[in-house]
Amino acid sequence: MAKEIKFSEDARTKMLKGVDKLADTVKSTIGPKGRNVVLEQSYGSPTITNDGVTIAKAIELEDHFENMGAKLVSEVASKTNDIAGDGTTTATVLTQAIVNEGMKNVTAGANPVGIRRGIEKATSKAVEALHKMSHEVKTKDDIAQIASISSANPEVGKLIANAMEKVGNDGVITIEESRGVDTTLDVVEGMQFDRGYMSQYMVTDNDKMEANLDNPYILITDKKIGNIQDILPVLQSVVEQSRSLLIIADDITGEALPTLVLNKMRGTFNVVAVKAPGFGDRRKEQLEDIAILTGGTVITDDLGLNLKDVTIEQLGQSNKVTVTKDDTTIVEGAGSQEQIAERVGIIKQQISETTSDFDKEKLQERLAKLSGGVAVIRVGAATETELKEKKYRIEDALNATRAAVEEGFVPGGGTALANVISDLEDVEAEGDEATGVNIVRRALEEPVRQIAENAGEEGSVIVTKLKGQKPGVGYNAANDEWVDMVEAGIVDPTKVTRSALQNAASVSALLLTTEAVVADLPEDNPAPAAPAPGMGGMM
Protein backbone atom coordinates (compact mmCIF):
# COMPACT_ATOMS: atom_id res chain seq x y z
CA MET A 1 0.00 0.00 0.00
CA ALA A 2 1.29 3.48 -0.90
CA LYS A 3 2.30 5.78 1.95
CA GLU A 4 2.07 9.50 2.57
CA ILE A 5 4.94 11.19 4.40
CA LYS A 6 4.92 14.53 6.19
CA PHE A 7 8.02 16.25 7.57
CA SER A 8 9.03 18.71 10.30
CA GLU A 9 6.46 21.33 11.17
CA ASP A 10 3.77 19.83 8.91
CA ALA A 11 4.09 16.49 10.69
CA ARG A 12 4.10 17.98 14.19
CA THR A 13 1.19 20.34 13.46
CA LYS A 14 -1.00 17.49 12.22
CA MET A 15 -0.18 15.33 15.23
CA LEU A 16 -0.78 18.28 17.56
CA LYS A 17 -4.32 18.62 16.17
CA GLY A 18 -4.97 14.99 17.09
CA VAL A 19 -3.50 15.50 20.56
CA ASP A 20 -5.77 18.50 21.13
CA LYS A 21 -8.92 16.79 19.86
CA LEU A 22 -8.48 13.84 22.19
CA ALA A 23 -7.24 15.86 25.18
CA ASP A 24 -10.04 18.46 24.88
CA THR A 25 -12.58 15.62 25.04
CA VAL A 26 -10.95 13.90 28.01
CA LYS A 27 -10.05 16.97 30.11
CA SER A 28 -13.69 18.07 30.36
CA THR A 29 -14.12 15.21 32.88
CA ILE A 30 -11.43 16.22 35.41
CA GLY A 31 -12.30 17.40 38.92
CA PRO A 32 -15.40 17.20 41.14
CA LYS A 33 -17.40 19.29 38.66
CA GLY A 34 -16.09 17.52 35.56
CA ARG A 35 -18.63 16.56 32.90
CA ASN A 36 -19.48 13.19 31.40
CA VAL A 37 -18.79 12.03 27.84
CA VAL A 38 -21.25 9.89 25.86
CA LEU A 39 -19.68 7.13 23.77
CA GLU A 40 -21.58 5.49 20.91
CA GLN A 41 -21.56 1.69 21.00
CA SER A 42 -21.75 -0.54 17.93
CA TYR A 43 -24.72 -2.23 19.60
CA GLY A 44 -26.84 -1.50 22.66
CA SER A 45 -27.23 1.77 24.50
CA PRO A 46 -24.43 4.38 24.53
CA THR A 47 -21.94 4.44 27.41
CA ILE A 48 -21.84 7.51 29.66
CA THR A 49 -18.53 7.88 31.47
CA ASN A 50 -15.98 10.26 32.93
CA ASP A 51 -13.20 7.66 32.88
CA GLY A 52 -10.27 9.11 30.94
CA VAL A 53 -8.82 5.89 29.55
CA THR A 54 -12.22 4.60 28.40
CA ILE A 55 -12.82 7.83 26.46
CA ALA A 56 -9.29 7.89 25.03
CA LYS A 57 -9.54 4.31 23.75
CA ALA A 58 -12.88 5.04 22.08
CA ILE A 59 -11.56 7.91 19.92
CA GLU A 60 -10.56 7.23 16.31
CA LEU A 61 -9.92 10.24 14.04
CA GLU A 62 -10.51 10.20 10.28
CA ASP A 63 -7.21 11.91 9.40
CA HIS A 64 -4.37 9.35 9.74
CA PHE A 65 -1.80 11.88 10.95
CA GLU A 66 -4.12 13.42 13.53
CA ASN A 67 -5.09 9.93 14.64
CA MET A 68 -1.44 9.09 15.34
CA GLY A 69 -1.19 12.09 17.68
CA ALA A 70 -4.41 11.06 19.40
CA LYS A 71 -3.22 7.45 19.76
CA LEU A 72 0.02 8.57 21.42
CA VAL A 73 -2.01 10.42 24.07
CA SER A 74 -4.28 7.40 24.40
CA GLU A 75 -1.11 5.38 25.06
CA VAL A 76 -0.24 7.76 27.93
CA ALA A 77 -3.67 7.19 29.46
CA SER A 78 -3.46 3.40 29.00
CA LYS A 79 0.06 3.16 30.44
CA THR A 80 -0.92 5.24 33.47
CA ASN A 81 -4.00 3.08 33.96
CA ASP A 82 -1.93 -0.12 33.70
CA ILE A 83 0.63 1.08 36.26
CA ALA A 84 -1.54 2.95 38.76
CA GLY A 85 -5.13 2.15 37.77
CA ASP A 86 -6.21 5.79 37.81
CA GLY A 87 -4.95 9.29 36.91
CA THR A 88 -5.57 8.90 33.19
CA THR A 89 -7.23 12.29 32.80
CA THR A 90 -4.42 14.04 34.68
CA ALA A 91 -1.88 12.30 32.42
CA THR A 92 -3.78 13.49 29.33
CA VAL A 93 -3.96 17.10 30.58
CA LEU A 94 -0.22 17.12 31.35
CA THR A 95 0.62 15.65 27.94
CA GLN A 96 -1.38 18.30 26.10
CA ALA A 97 0.24 21.09 28.12
CA ILE A 98 3.82 19.83 27.56
CA VAL A 99 3.26 19.16 23.84
CA ASN A 100 1.64 22.55 23.15
CA GLU A 101 4.34 24.55 24.95
CA GLY A 102 7.05 22.40 23.41
CA MET A 103 5.70 22.80 19.87
CA LYS A 104 5.72 26.60 20.21
CA ASN A 105 9.40 26.53 21.16
CA VAL A 106 10.41 24.02 18.48
CA THR A 107 8.60 26.09 15.84
CA ALA A 108 10.47 29.17 17.10
CA GLY A 109 13.79 27.39 16.45
CA ALA A 110 14.63 25.60 19.71
CA ASN A 111 16.39 22.23 19.52
CA PRO A 112 13.86 19.49 20.38
CA VAL A 113 16.59 17.16 21.72
CA GLY A 114 17.71 19.83 24.21
CA ILE A 115 14.09 20.43 25.21
CA ARG A 116 13.62 16.69 25.76
CA ARG A 117 16.62 16.55 28.10
CA GLY A 118 15.22 19.48 30.06
CA ILE A 119 11.80 17.79 30.31
CA GLU A 120 13.45 14.59 31.59
CA LYS A 121 15.52 16.46 34.22
CA ALA A 122 12.49 18.43 35.44
CA THR A 123 10.29 15.32 35.61
CA SER A 124 12.89 13.43 37.62
CA LYS A 125 13.16 16.31 40.11
CA ALA A 126 9.36 16.67 40.36
CA VAL A 127 8.91 12.93 41.07
CA GLU A 128 11.57 13.14 43.79
CA ALA A 129 9.69 16.09 45.36
CA LEU A 130 6.36 14.20 45.20
CA HIS A 131 7.85 11.29 47.15
CA LYS A 132 9.16 13.70 49.81
CA MET A 133 5.69 15.19 50.42
CA SER A 134 3.96 11.79 50.35
CA HIS A 135 1.95 10.62 53.41
CA GLU A 136 1.64 6.96 54.38
CA VAL A 137 -1.81 5.33 54.43
CA LYS A 138 -2.39 4.45 58.08
CA THR A 139 -6.10 4.33 58.81
CA LYS A 140 -9.37 3.11 57.38
CA ASP A 141 -10.39 6.78 57.02
CA ASP A 142 -7.39 7.42 54.75
CA ILE A 143 -8.55 4.63 52.44
CA ALA A 144 -12.16 5.87 52.49
CA GLN A 145 -11.05 9.41 51.56
CA ILE A 146 -8.91 8.26 48.63
CA ALA A 147 -11.67 6.01 47.26
CA SER A 148 -14.29 8.76 47.77
CA ILE A 149 -12.25 11.31 45.80
CA SER A 150 -11.55 8.90 42.94
CA SER A 151 -15.17 7.77 42.61
CA ALA A 152 -16.73 11.13 43.57
CA ASN A 153 -18.96 9.15 45.93
CA PRO A 154 -18.45 8.90 49.74
CA GLU A 155 -20.56 5.70 49.90
CA VAL A 156 -18.19 3.96 47.50
CA GLY A 157 -15.30 5.18 49.67
CA LYS A 158 -16.80 3.53 52.76
CA LEU A 159 -17.53 0.33 50.84
CA ILE A 160 -13.93 -0.04 49.61
CA ALA A 161 -12.52 0.86 53.04
CA ASN A 162 -14.69 -1.87 54.61
CA ALA A 163 -13.61 -4.37 51.97
CA MET A 164 -9.90 -3.66 52.49
CA GLU A 165 -10.32 -3.81 56.25
CA LYS A 166 -11.89 -7.28 55.95
CA VAL A 167 -9.47 -8.89 53.47
CA GLY A 168 -6.29 -6.88 54.07
CA ASN A 169 -4.17 -4.89 51.64
CA ASP A 170 -3.20 -8.01 49.68
CA GLY A 171 -6.73 -9.41 49.58
CA VAL A 172 -8.67 -9.85 46.36
CA ILE A 173 -11.56 -7.42 45.85
CA THR A 174 -13.67 -8.21 42.81
CA ILE A 175 -16.39 -6.07 41.26
CA GLU A 176 -19.50 -7.75 39.88
CA GLU A 177 -22.83 -6.57 38.53
CA SER A 178 -25.82 -6.94 40.86
CA ARG A 179 -29.35 -7.71 39.78
CA GLY A 180 -30.77 -5.18 42.21
CA VAL A 181 -30.39 -1.41 42.52
CA ASP A 182 -28.27 -1.45 45.70
CA THR A 183 -24.49 -1.72 45.80
CA THR A 184 -23.41 -4.23 48.44
CA LEU A 185 -20.30 -5.88 49.86
CA ASP A 186 -19.91 -9.63 50.42
CA VAL A 187 -16.79 -10.96 52.12
CA VAL A 188 -15.60 -14.57 51.96
CA GLU A 189 -13.21 -15.05 54.86
CA GLY A 190 -10.58 -17.77 54.68
CA MET A 191 -9.53 -19.70 51.60
CA GLN A 192 -12.15 -20.47 48.98
CA PHE A 193 -11.72 -22.51 45.79
CA ASP A 194 -14.23 -23.41 43.09
CA ARG A 195 -14.81 -27.10 43.76
CA GLY A 196 -17.95 -28.45 45.43
CA TYR A 197 -18.90 -31.76 47.06
CA MET A 198 -18.76 -34.89 44.89
CA SER A 199 -22.07 -36.18 46.21
CA GLN A 200 -25.10 -34.26 47.45
CA TYR A 201 -25.56 -36.98 50.10
CA MET A 202 -22.61 -35.41 51.92
CA VAL A 203 -24.55 -32.25 52.86
CA THR A 204 -25.24 -31.56 56.53
CA ASP A 205 -27.64 -28.62 56.04
CA ASN A 206 -30.45 -29.65 53.69
CA ASP A 207 -32.04 -26.18 53.67
CA LYS A 208 -28.91 -24.47 52.36
CA MET A 209 -27.65 -27.61 50.59
CA GLU A 210 -24.18 -27.26 52.10
CA ALA A 211 -21.87 -29.42 54.17
CA ASN A 212 -20.44 -27.88 57.34
CA LEU A 213 -17.47 -29.49 59.08
CA ASP A 214 -16.37 -28.19 62.49
CA ASN A 215 -12.72 -28.64 63.45
CA PRO A 216 -12.08 -31.18 60.65
CA TYR A 217 -8.95 -32.98 59.55
CA ILE A 218 -8.05 -32.37 55.89
CA LEU A 219 -6.49 -35.01 53.62
CA ILE A 220 -4.74 -33.29 50.69
CA THR A 221 -3.54 -35.34 47.72
CA ASP A 222 -3.03 -35.04 43.96
CA LYS A 223 -3.76 -38.76 43.53
CA LYS A 224 -6.93 -40.53 42.41
CA ILE A 225 -8.59 -42.61 45.12
CA GLY A 226 -10.21 -45.67 43.57
CA ASN A 227 -9.91 -48.20 46.39
CA ILE A 228 -11.22 -47.48 49.91
CA GLN A 229 -8.47 -49.73 51.29
CA ASP A 230 -5.91 -47.07 50.26
CA ILE A 231 -7.27 -44.59 52.81
CA LEU A 232 -8.73 -47.02 55.38
CA PRO A 233 -5.87 -46.60 57.92
CA VAL A 234 -6.23 -42.81 58.02
CA LEU A 235 -10.05 -43.04 58.12
CA GLN A 236 -9.84 -45.27 61.20
CA SER A 237 -7.49 -42.78 62.89
CA VAL A 238 -9.94 -39.94 62.23
CA VAL A 239 -12.92 -41.98 63.53
CA GLU A 240 -11.00 -42.84 66.71
CA GLN A 241 -10.61 -39.12 67.41
CA SER A 242 -14.33 -38.44 66.70
CA ARG A 243 -13.42 -35.77 64.16
CA SER A 244 -14.84 -34.99 60.71
CA LEU A 245 -12.77 -35.22 57.51
CA LEU A 246 -12.43 -33.21 54.29
CA ILE A 247 -10.79 -35.11 51.43
CA ILE A 248 -9.25 -33.03 48.62
CA ALA A 249 -8.13 -35.38 45.83
CA ASP A 250 -7.64 -35.47 42.06
CA ASP A 251 -10.73 -37.69 41.91
CA ILE A 252 -12.54 -40.39 43.88
CA THR A 253 -13.69 -43.25 41.70
CA GLY A 254 -14.78 -46.89 41.83
CA GLU A 255 -16.23 -48.13 45.11
CA ALA A 256 -14.40 -45.51 47.22
CA LEU A 257 -17.00 -42.73 46.82
CA PRO A 258 -20.12 -44.89 47.51
CA THR A 259 -18.37 -46.35 50.57
CA LEU A 260 -17.65 -42.87 51.97
CA VAL A 261 -21.25 -41.75 51.29
CA LEU A 262 -22.66 -44.89 52.96
CA ASN A 263 -20.58 -44.35 56.11
CA LYS A 264 -21.63 -40.69 56.19
CA MET A 265 -25.35 -41.60 55.91
CA ARG A 266 -25.03 -44.28 58.62
CA GLY A 267 -23.48 -41.70 60.93
CA THR A 268 -20.17 -43.55 61.25
CA PHE A 269 -18.35 -40.27 60.68
CA ASN A 270 -18.81 -36.94 58.88
CA VAL A 271 -16.85 -36.82 55.61
CA VAL A 272 -16.91 -34.58 52.52
CA ALA A 273 -14.92 -35.21 49.35
CA VAL A 274 -14.04 -32.53 46.78
CA LYS A 275 -11.86 -32.48 43.69
CA ALA A 276 -8.53 -30.63 43.85
CA PRO A 277 -8.67 -27.07 42.43
CA GLY A 278 -6.78 -25.93 39.33
CA PHE A 279 -5.01 -27.87 36.62
CA GLY A 280 -1.46 -29.05 35.94
CA ASP A 281 1.31 -27.15 37.73
CA ARG A 282 -1.22 -24.65 39.13
CA ARG A 283 -3.01 -27.54 40.87
CA LYS A 284 0.21 -28.57 42.62
CA GLU A 285 0.84 -24.99 43.75
CA GLN A 286 -2.72 -24.56 45.05
CA LEU A 287 -2.62 -27.85 46.94
CA GLU A 288 0.66 -26.75 48.52
CA ASP A 289 -1.02 -23.44 49.51
CA ILE A 290 -3.86 -25.38 51.19
CA ALA A 291 -1.36 -27.63 52.97
CA ILE A 292 0.62 -24.66 54.33
CA LEU A 293 -2.57 -22.85 55.39
CA THR A 294 -3.88 -25.91 57.26
CA GLY A 295 -0.59 -27.32 58.55
CA GLY A 296 -0.82 -30.49 56.48
CA THR A 297 1.27 -32.27 53.85
CA VAL A 298 0.36 -32.87 50.20
CA ILE A 299 0.36 -36.64 49.65
CA THR A 300 2.07 -36.87 46.27
CA ASP A 301 4.42 -39.15 44.36
CA ASP A 302 6.80 -36.18 44.05
CA LEU A 303 7.53 -36.59 47.77
CA GLY A 304 7.44 -40.41 47.62
CA LEU A 305 4.31 -40.56 49.80
CA ASN A 306 1.60 -43.25 49.56
CA LEU A 307 -2.01 -42.97 50.71
CA LYS A 308 -1.77 -46.24 52.68
CA ASP A 309 1.03 -44.80 54.81
CA VAL A 310 -0.66 -41.48 55.68
CA THR A 311 -0.60 -40.64 59.39
CA ILE A 312 -2.84 -38.28 61.33
CA GLU A 313 0.12 -35.85 61.64
CA GLN A 314 0.20 -35.39 57.86
CA LEU A 315 -3.41 -34.18 57.74
CA GLY A 316 -4.26 -30.49 57.73
CA GLN A 317 -6.71 -28.97 60.22
CA SER A 318 -8.98 -25.93 60.35
CA ASN A 319 -11.59 -24.38 62.59
CA LYS A 320 -14.37 -24.77 60.03
CA VAL A 321 -14.99 -25.91 56.45
CA THR A 322 -18.10 -25.10 54.41
CA VAL A 323 -18.73 -26.93 51.12
CA THR A 324 -21.50 -26.06 48.64
CA LYS A 325 -22.18 -27.68 45.26
CA ASP A 326 -19.80 -25.13 43.69
CA ASP A 327 -17.28 -23.97 46.32
CA THR A 328 -15.21 -25.06 49.29
CA THR A 329 -14.24 -22.54 51.99
CA ILE A 330 -11.60 -23.27 54.63
CA VAL A 331 -11.72 -20.89 57.62
CA GLU A 332 -8.91 -20.46 60.17
CA GLY A 333 -6.43 -23.08 59.01
CA ALA A 334 -4.05 -24.47 61.64
CA GLY A 335 -0.87 -23.76 59.63
CA SER A 336 2.21 -22.05 61.04
CA GLN A 337 2.09 -18.27 60.63
CA GLU A 338 5.81 -18.27 59.81
CA GLN A 339 5.33 -20.76 56.98
CA ILE A 340 2.31 -18.84 55.66
CA ALA A 341 4.31 -15.57 55.72
CA GLU A 342 7.19 -17.29 53.90
CA ARG A 343 4.79 -18.64 51.26
CA VAL A 344 3.22 -15.18 50.84
CA GLY A 345 6.72 -13.74 50.30
CA ILE A 346 7.47 -16.30 47.58
CA ILE A 347 4.20 -15.52 45.75
CA LYS A 348 4.85 -11.76 45.96
CA GLN A 349 8.27 -12.35 44.43
CA GLN A 350 6.69 -14.34 41.59
CA ILE A 351 4.16 -11.53 40.99
CA SER A 352 6.96 -8.96 40.66
CA GLU A 353 8.88 -11.18 38.21
CA THR A 354 6.09 -12.41 35.91
CA THR A 355 5.37 -10.60 32.64
CA SER A 356 2.06 -12.37 31.96
CA ASP A 357 -1.11 -10.54 33.06
CA PHE A 358 -2.93 -13.89 33.34
CA ASP A 359 -0.23 -15.40 35.56
CA LYS A 360 -0.15 -12.24 37.66
CA GLU A 361 -3.92 -12.40 38.19
CA LYS A 362 -3.76 -16.06 39.26
CA LEU A 363 -0.84 -15.38 41.61
CA GLN A 364 -2.71 -12.45 43.18
CA GLU A 365 -5.73 -14.70 43.76
CA ARG A 366 -3.49 -17.23 45.53
CA LEU A 367 -1.92 -14.45 47.57
CA ALA A 368 -5.32 -13.17 48.65
CA LYS A 369 -6.51 -16.60 49.70
CA LEU A 370 -3.45 -17.06 51.90
CA SER A 371 -3.58 -13.49 53.24
CA GLY A 372 -7.14 -13.19 54.38
CA GLY A 373 -9.95 -13.71 51.93
CA VAL A 374 -11.94 -12.36 49.02
CA ALA A 375 -14.36 -9.43 48.98
CA VAL A 376 -17.00 -9.01 46.28
CA ILE A 377 -18.54 -5.58 45.60
CA ARG A 378 -21.86 -6.10 43.82
CA VAL A 379 -22.72 -2.94 41.87
CA GLY A 380 -26.41 -2.12 41.54
CA ALA A 381 -28.16 0.58 39.49
CA ALA A 382 -31.55 1.42 38.00
CA THR A 383 -30.41 1.20 34.36
CA GLU A 384 -27.69 -0.60 32.41
CA THR A 385 -26.11 2.73 31.39
CA GLU A 386 -25.88 3.88 35.01
CA LEU A 387 -24.54 0.47 36.02
CA LYS A 388 -21.63 0.68 33.54
CA GLU A 389 -20.75 4.21 34.66
CA LYS A 390 -20.91 3.26 38.34
CA LYS A 391 -18.76 0.19 37.74
CA TYR A 392 -16.06 2.29 36.01
CA ARG A 393 -15.99 4.67 38.99
CA ILE A 394 -15.67 1.86 41.54
CA GLU A 395 -12.89 0.19 39.53
CA ASP A 396 -10.98 3.50 39.41
CA ALA A 397 -11.50 4.03 43.14
CA LEU A 398 -10.27 0.53 43.97
CA ASN A 399 -7.17 0.97 41.81
CA ALA A 400 -6.44 4.37 43.34
CA THR A 401 -6.75 2.93 46.83
CA ARG A 402 -4.33 0.10 46.08
CA ALA A 403 -1.87 2.61 44.60
CA ALA A 404 -2.10 4.75 47.76
CA VAL A 405 -1.45 1.76 50.02
CA GLU A 406 1.65 1.03 47.93
CA GLU A 407 3.29 4.49 47.75
CA GLY A 408 1.22 6.77 50.00
CA PHE A 409 -0.78 9.86 49.07
CA VAL A 410 -0.26 13.57 48.34
CA PRO A 411 -2.56 16.63 48.44
CA GLY A 412 -5.19 16.25 45.69
CA GLY A 413 -6.89 18.54 43.23
CA GLY A 414 -3.64 19.16 41.33
CA THR A 415 -2.17 20.86 44.41
CA ALA A 416 0.77 18.46 44.77
CA LEU A 417 1.88 19.02 41.17
CA ALA A 418 1.63 22.79 41.58
CA ASN A 419 3.56 22.63 44.87
CA VAL A 420 6.58 20.91 43.29
CA ILE A 421 7.07 23.75 40.77
CA SER A 422 9.32 25.58 43.27
CA ASP A 423 11.57 22.50 43.52
CA LEU A 424 12.40 22.79 39.81
CA GLU A 425 14.36 25.99 40.48
CA ASP A 426 17.21 23.75 41.69
CA VAL A 427 17.48 21.94 38.34
CA GLU A 428 20.73 22.81 36.58
CA ALA A 429 19.98 23.53 32.93
CA GLU A 430 20.93 26.04 30.26
CA GLY A 431 19.68 27.03 26.82
CA ASP A 432 17.15 24.61 25.34
CA GLU A 433 17.37 22.35 28.41
CA ALA A 434 16.25 25.29 30.57
CA THR A 435 13.37 25.77 28.12
CA GLY A 436 12.39 22.12 28.67
CA VAL A 437 12.41 22.65 32.45
CA ASN A 438 10.19 25.73 32.08
CA ILE A 439 7.77 23.78 29.87
CA VAL A 440 7.29 21.25 32.69
CA ARG A 441 6.91 24.09 35.26
CA ARG A 442 4.09 25.55 33.16
CA ALA A 443 2.48 22.13 32.57
CA LEU A 444 2.38 21.34 36.31
CA GLU A 445 -0.15 24.18 36.74
CA GLU A 446 -2.49 22.73 34.14
CA PRO A 447 -4.47 20.18 36.23
CA VAL A 448 -5.44 22.90 38.76
CA ARG A 449 -6.28 25.28 35.92
CA GLN A 450 -8.53 22.71 34.22
CA ILE A 451 -10.26 21.64 37.45
CA ALA A 452 -11.08 25.31 38.13
CA GLU A 453 -12.35 25.91 34.59
CA ASN A 454 -14.59 22.83 34.76
CA ALA A 455 -16.02 24.32 37.97
CA GLY A 456 -16.81 27.59 36.16
CA GLU A 457 -13.89 29.60 37.56
CA GLU A 458 -11.09 31.44 35.76
CA GLY A 459 -8.21 28.95 35.76
CA SER A 460 -5.39 31.53 35.66
CA VAL A 461 -6.80 33.37 38.68
CA ILE A 462 -6.98 30.16 40.74
CA VAL A 463 -3.40 29.19 39.76
CA THR A 464 -2.10 32.64 40.79
CA LYS A 465 -3.91 32.40 44.15
CA LEU A 466 -2.56 28.89 44.71
CA LYS A 467 1.02 30.12 44.34
CA GLY A 468 0.39 32.47 47.27
CA GLN A 469 -0.85 29.70 49.59
CA LYS A 470 1.34 27.63 51.90
CA PRO A 471 2.20 24.10 50.63
CA GLY A 472 -0.68 21.64 50.96
CA VAL A 473 -3.40 24.30 50.79
CA GLY A 474 -5.41 24.04 47.59
CA TYR A 475 -8.63 24.91 45.80
CA ASN A 476 -11.62 22.72 46.68
CA ALA A 477 -13.63 23.05 43.47
CA ALA A 478 -16.56 21.11 44.91
CA ASN A 479 -17.28 23.81 47.54
CA ASP A 480 -15.42 26.76 45.96
CA GLU A 481 -13.10 27.24 48.97
CA TRP A 482 -9.42 27.13 49.93
CA VAL A 483 -8.55 24.34 52.35
CA ASP A 484 -5.70 22.18 53.62
CA MET A 485 -6.24 19.36 51.12
CA VAL A 486 -5.02 16.50 53.33
CA GLU A 487 -7.09 17.65 56.33
CA ALA A 488 -10.13 18.01 54.07
CA GLY A 489 -9.60 14.47 52.76
CA ILE A 490 -8.89 15.64 49.21
CA VAL A 491 -5.92 13.45 48.35
CA ASP A 492 -4.45 11.58 45.39
CA PRO A 493 -2.28 8.44 45.50
CA THR A 494 1.39 9.34 45.01
CA LYS A 495 1.76 6.49 42.51
CA VAL A 496 -1.09 7.86 40.38
CA THR A 497 0.27 11.43 40.34
CA ARG A 498 3.84 10.24 39.71
CA SER A 499 2.87 7.85 36.91
CA ALA A 500 0.71 10.48 35.21
CA LEU A 501 3.63 12.94 35.10
CA GLN A 502 6.27 10.40 34.04
CA ASN A 503 4.17 8.93 31.23
CA ALA A 504 3.05 12.36 30.00
CA ALA A 505 6.66 13.60 29.91
CA SER A 506 7.88 10.46 28.14
CA VAL A 507 5.39 10.55 25.25
CA SER A 508 5.50 14.36 24.96
CA ALA A 509 9.29 14.25 24.53
CA LEU A 510 8.89 11.65 21.77
CA LEU A 511 6.30 13.80 20.00
CA LEU A 512 8.50 16.90 20.14
CA THR A 513 11.48 15.08 18.63
CA THR A 514 9.40 13.68 15.74
CA GLU A 515 10.73 14.82 12.35
CA ALA A 516 8.72 12.65 9.95
CA VAL A 517 5.37 10.87 10.03
CA VAL A 518 4.37 8.04 7.67
CA ALA A 519 0.74 7.06 7.09
CA ASP A 520 -1.26 4.99 4.62
CA LEU A 521 -2.73 6.88 1.69
CA PRO A 522 -6.54 6.69 1.69
CA GLU A 523 -7.82 4.15 -0.83
CA ASP A 524 -9.98 5.39 -3.70
CA ASN A 525 -13.32 3.61 -3.75
CA PRO A 526 -13.31 1.28 -6.79
CA ALA A 527 -16.02 1.87 -9.39
CA PRO A 528 -18.98 -0.52 -9.09
CA ALA A 529 -18.86 -3.50 -11.45
CA ALA A 530 -20.84 -3.09 -14.69
CA PRO A 531 -23.91 -5.35 -14.99
CA ALA A 532 -23.52 -8.43 -17.17
CA PRO A 533 -24.90 -8.03 -20.73
CA GLY A 534 -28.42 -9.23 -21.32
CA MET A 535 -29.33 -9.03 -17.61
CA GLY A 536 -31.28 -5.78 -17.72
CA GLY A 537 -34.76 -5.80 -16.26
CA MET A 538 -34.05 -8.65 -13.85
CA MET A 539 -35.29 -8.08 -10.31
UniProtKB/Swiss-Prot annotation:
Any GO MF annotation of the entry: unfolded protein binding
Pfam families: Cpn60_TCP1
Gene3D superfamilies xrefs: GroEL (3.50.7.10), GroEL-like equatorial domain (1.10.560.10), TCP-1-like chaperonin intermediate domain (3.30.260.10)
Keyword Disulfide bond belongs to the record: no
GO annotation terms (biological process): protein refolding
Top-level lineage group: Bacteria
Record-linked CDD domains: GroEL
InterPro entries: Chaperonin_Cpn60_CS (IPR018370), Cpn60/GroEL (IPR001844), Cpn60/GroEL/TCP-1 (IPR002423), GroEL-like_apical_dom_sf (IPR027409), GROEL-like_equatorial_sf (IPR027413), TCP-1-like_intermed_sf (IPR027410)
Reactions it catalyzes: ATP + H2O + a folded polypeptide = ADP + phosphate + an unfolded polypeptide
Protein name, UniProt field: Chaperonin GroEL
PROSITE patterns in UniProt: CHAPERONINS_CPN60
One Gene Ontology CC term in the entry: cytoplasm
Localization (cell): Cytoplasm
Keyword flag Cytoplasm: yes
EC number(s) recorded for this UniProt protein: 5.6.1.7
UniProt entry keywords in alphabetical sequence: ATP-binding, Chaperone, Cytoplasm, Isomerase, Nucleotide-binding
Family statement drawn from the similarity comment of this UniProt entry: Belongs to the chaperonin (HSP60) family.
Top-level class of the enzyme under EC nomenclature: isomerase
Subunit structure: Forms a cylinder of 14 subunits composed of two heptameric rings stacked back-to-back. Interacts with the co-chaperonin GroES.
Location, primary (coarse class): cytoplasm
